[in-house]
């Protein structure tokens, strides 16, 4: 009889344990968003050429609406202007009842002439921040570094240490005729960043990290391949984000009316195991078309 009571007690304890475990699990939503020139610049506004003009208010309202809709725990930004522009976005979210982000990070570009910078908002505590400006690569007899650098942020979720690397690779615009669409430079950038990540986060250490941002290239391009695999070693995998119609493009170039997938979330094998199935999305709808020429991407991870 004592054995029966013991077994009954054990069976009662199992669902309790499962329930308690589910309560302690932590789901983190990670997003990446190219804000399309959230800064002062010469631009066309409602059909008129305007000099030294800020991002139009209707575009700002649309992107705030997207941030509120997605309500990510961590969101990486590309194409933000100087620090006051990030402060403006943070304050506008607060006064319009958007998501509250206690942690805001702004990273200046490594190139003094570059006006587009990297940034990050986070609801969860930040363990450490590193701003990489010293990643070098050879380029036509010279030594170069990624113009915008790489922003590295470390978190601890439910006892698991993980990192996010935010980047914005070289665009296809270039004045060099010997490097059409800057393909060589972008590949060299990607290779150098990849090697830096491998050195600080060896694959055999089963590191948890994400590489997110605007890669300015297609999924089968050399820059993307550099991040995915070296010989037989898998470094990261692309998380297949899609919109409500199953489409996967993230950038619309209005001049050519072309649609491309330039924005990605790449996850190491241990991080990929934490992906919540079906959570990887691309935000569509009228606000997306108005806020930026890029669409926000996001995915959930369980810790």
Where are these regions (language model features)?
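Structured beta-strand-rich core segments of catalytic domains in phosphoester-bond hydrolases
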Residues: 80-169
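N-terminal, active-site-proximal structural segment of metallo-dependent hydrolase catalytic domains
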Residues: 23-96, 106-115, 191
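Metal-dependent phosphoester/phosphodiester hydrolase catalytic core
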Residues: 158-165, 169-188
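Second-shell loop/turn segments in exported
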Residues: 48-54, 71-79, 106-109, 139-141, ...
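Bacterial N-terminal signal peptides that target proteins for export
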Residues: 1-14
């Amino acid at each position: 009889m004592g054995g029966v009571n013991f077994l009954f007690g054990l069976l009662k304890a199992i669902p309790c344990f499962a329930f308690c475990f589910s309560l302690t699990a932590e789901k983190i939503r990670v997003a990446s968003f190219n804000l399309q020139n959230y800064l002062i610049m010469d631009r066309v506004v409602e059909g008129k050429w305007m000099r030294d003009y800020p991002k139009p208010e209707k575009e700002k309202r649309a992107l705030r609406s997207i941030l509120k809709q997605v309500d990510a725990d961590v969101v990486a930004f590309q194409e933000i202007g100087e620090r006051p522009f990030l402060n403006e976005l943070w304050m506008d979210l607060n006064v319009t009842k958007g998501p509250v982000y206690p942690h805001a990070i702004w990273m200046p570009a490594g190139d003094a002439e570059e006006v587009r910078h990297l940034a990050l908002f986070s609801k969860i505590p930040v363990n450490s921040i590193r701003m990489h400006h010293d990643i070098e690569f050879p380029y036509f007899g010279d030594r170069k570094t990624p113009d915008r650098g790489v922003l590295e942020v470390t978190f601890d979720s439910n006892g698991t240490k993980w990192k996010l690397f935010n980047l914005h690779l070289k665009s296809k615009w270039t004045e060099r005729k010997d490097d059409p669409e800057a393909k060589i430079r972008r590949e060299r950038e990607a290779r150098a960043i990849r090697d830096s990540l491998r050195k600080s986060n060896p694959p055999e250490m089963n590191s948890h990290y994400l590489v997110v941002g605007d890669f300015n290239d297609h999924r089968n391009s050399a820059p993307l391949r550099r991040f995915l695999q070296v010989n037989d070693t898998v470094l990261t995998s692309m998380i297949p984000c899609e919109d409500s119609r199953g489409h996967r493009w993230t950038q619309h170039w209005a001049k050519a009316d072309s649609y491309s997938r330039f924005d990605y979330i790449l996850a190491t094998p241990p991080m990929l195991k934490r992906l919540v199935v079906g959570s990887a999305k691309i935000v569509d709808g009228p606000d997306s078309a108005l806020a930026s020429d890029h669409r926000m991407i996001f995915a959930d991870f369980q810790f």
